[in-house]
Amino acid sequence: MLYWALVFLVVAIIAGALGFGGIAGTSAGIAQILFFIFLAFLVISLLAGLFRRA
């Protein structure tokens, strides 16, 4: 699950860079939402991995 969270975070960062840079101005809001959703998934996955090992 951590692997997929990292993959989706990278995709969201790329989409965010395109959206925030003005290349795809209409999708900037969607890119922002996806970025923060997948960032939250990354944090949750990291915490779950830490608690699972402890």
UniProtKB/Swiss-Prot annotation:
| Pfam families for the chain | DUF1328 (PF07043)
Provide the alphabetized UniProt keywords.
Cell membrane, Membrane, Transmembrane, Transmembrane helix
Transmembrane domains' residue ranges: 4-24, 30-50
- Subcellular localization, as worded in the UniProt entry: Cell membrane
Q: For this UniProt entry, what's an example GO CC term?
A: plasma membrane
Q: Give the matching InterPro entries.
A: DUF1328 (IPR009760)
- How is this protein positioned relative to the membrane? Multi-pass membrane protein
Q: Which HAMAP family match?
A: UPF0391 (MF_01361)
Q: Which family does it belong to?
A: Belongs to the UPF0391 family.
Q: What is this protein called?
A: UPF0391 membrane protein msr3702
